[in-house]
């Protein structure tokens, strides 16, 4: 398992270094014009927890994404919550679309960001997760997510979350709207996206290896140490 997990970490590092090579540091870089997220995005906003909290969640239905699901560069589907149609109706303004970038905006996991998996389009987010929906004719979601998860932008987001003497980390909607990101040429963005798509194929294989080895370990452990 360790070798496969190490391979996954290497792939993440490869994508990060390729990003810096192509676009530079997203906080310091001045080759490209900078644009506010308010200008770039067609949607910036978080949702709410249904009345009744955890007890109100269902065993199936419409997915409700929480901060525990959002990790840097990947989505964790374990412990995914579900709500019913009536609860979802109240959160229609945060209906997820294919290509949305997710960003944790409060708590210990603040600043974590990933792309929404396509199969969760139509779901909702709670108050700890913001939808960041960029105009794909100006910036590809994959590029925006790579900006958010770069080391320097992570530091920038974390610093922002601790400003104004807040008792807990938080990035407000006003903060988000005024944040700027570099806007490289779309042709260069497509080249980067093609590179990441190739890396993702290797990532998928490595992930499958980890899961197979875990299943093998679990079955052996059950056989030798079980009842």
Go through each PLM region and give its residues.
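Non-catalytic DNA-recognition/assembly elements of restriction-modification systems
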Residues: 2-48, 178, 182-191, 197-227
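Low-complexity, Lys/Gly-biased intrinsically disordered segments
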Residues: 30-73, 87-91
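Short, ligand-facing micro-motifs at secondary-structure edges
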Residues: 71-82, 101-104, 108-126, 142-146, ...
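Short loop segments at secondary-structure junctions
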Residues: 119, 134-137
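A short glycine-rich beta-alpha junction/loop motif
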Residues: 122-130, 139-142, 162-190
